[in-house]
Structure formats: structure tokens, C-alpha cells
């Protein structure tokens, strides 16, 4: 996992964002927090903080979904993004009442040993660009 976290940190640095936190959860999962993410045009803000979960059992268990902080993340016209809503918590999160917008976004197929946290973050970026 350390090698993957270093690779994600380097990818973020090159992309102009920052991997700022890795919060270990009691269930064995790990919340990853990436700040200052360029999300492209069409949103109600220019940059975002992205949170995603390396689930218990990762990499055999694939990442699933992601969150934008703070919540109330919307399209520029005020509409709720496709497959998103406010109020769905991060599974196992120890921060009560964390203010996020949840994106139901899934990766298929996932191949442990080949697919990485960098790949999943790239999938998140492809969901955010273009805005929809």
C-alpha cells in the first residue's frame, strides 16, 4: 500500500492537487483526501476536495464511489449531478456529520495487482470532466 500511496501522491503533485490525508478507519479501510482538484468547467466551483475509500481488503476489494467536500456540489446551473446526492456517508467514517456530496460511481472490471489507487483517481477525474 505504501508504494501505491507514494504513486498517488506523485500523480496528484503533477496534476496540481495534493494528497493531504490518509485516515485509517476501524474497519480497516482508508479514506484518501485529495485537495485542490481541478474539476474543469460546468460546476458551481472551480476546484474541489475529493475523498475516496480504499476499502477493507484492498486491493482484492475494489474502490467504489467517491465524495466531494464540502457538500452541496452542483452543476453550474444549480442541478444535482447525475448519480449523486448529499447525505450518503462514507462507510465506516469516524467523522460525524461530514458535509459531502456522494457520487455513485463504479469501476468494472477491477483487477487486483494491476489496477491501482492512481487508476481509480483517474476514473474519478473522468467522471468530473465533463460536468454532468
Predicted ranges, named:
Residues 1-45, 57-132:
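UBC/E2-like fold recognition across ubiquitin and ubiquitin-like conjugation systems
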Residues 54:
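Short beta-strand-loop-alpha-helix junction that forms the active-site gateway
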Amino acid at each position: 500500500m505504501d508504494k501505491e500511496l507514494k504513486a498517488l501522491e506523485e500523480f496528484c503533485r503533477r496534476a496540481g492537487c495534493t494528497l493531504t490525508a490518509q485516515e485509517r478507519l476501524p474497519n480497516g479501510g482508508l479514506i484518501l483526501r485529495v485537495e485542490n482538484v481541478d474539476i474543469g468547467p460546468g460546476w458551481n466551483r472551480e476546484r474541489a476536495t475529493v475523498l475516496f475509500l480504499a476499502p477493507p481488503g484492498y486491493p482484492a476489494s475494489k474502490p467504489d464511489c467517491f465524495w466531494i467536500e464540502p457538500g452541496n456540489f452542483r452543476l453550474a446551473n444549480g442541478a444535482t449531478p447525475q448519480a449523486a446526492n448529499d447525505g450518503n456517508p462514507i462507510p465506516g467514517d469516524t467523522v460525524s456529520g461530514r458535509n459531502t456530496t456522494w457520487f455513485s460511481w463504479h469501476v468494472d472490471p477491477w483487477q487486483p495487482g494491476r489496477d491501482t489507487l492512481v487508476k481509480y483517481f483517474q476514473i474519478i477525474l473522468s467522471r468530473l470532466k465533463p460536468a454532468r
